[in-house]
Structures are given as C-alpha cells and as structure tokens.
Amino acid sequence: MTDHVAVRGIVNGRVQGVFFRASMVREARRLGVAGWVQNLVDGRVGFTAQGPQDRVDALVAWSRRGPLGARVDDVEIISARVDPEQGTFEVR
C-alpha cells in the first residue's frame, strides 16, 4: 500500500440535503477509493479518501462539483495518513 495516498477534505456550500454523501459513496466506490464521508454540524461535509493518487485526485475533483442540486463554494484538502484498516468507502 506504499503507493497509496490519503487526504481529508471539507466541502463548503449547499452540500447537505442534496444527496452529497450518498453520491460521494457511489463515486468513491466506482473509483475504488476507500474512506468515509459525513455531515458536519456547521452545514459542511467532511470526508477522507485514500487509494492510488490518480483515483483520489479524481474523487477530490468530483467533490469540487458535487451531485446535481449541490452548490460547492470551496473544498479544503489536507494530506492525511493512510489507514490500512479502511477497506471501503462509507457514510459516517
């Protein structure tokens, strides 16, 4: 798993109540990326993603658009540690 990378992201905008989490799970699983996504109490969405660099980059690019009905104003991304226990992508 040495060629894998991990990131944490915070998505700002109209991202709750628009199926952002369910859509991100679907996209992450399609890409073969592991991690999780959750609603935050302040109205943002947080996520972690890990896998091959190109696939993680693709999911981050998707998060900047989001699903139909979402309005993404900003996405903050920071590097994270790969979690070898995280084998799938899920809603938390």
Label each region the model flagged.
Residues M1-R92:
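Intrinsically disordered, low-complexity, mixed-charge
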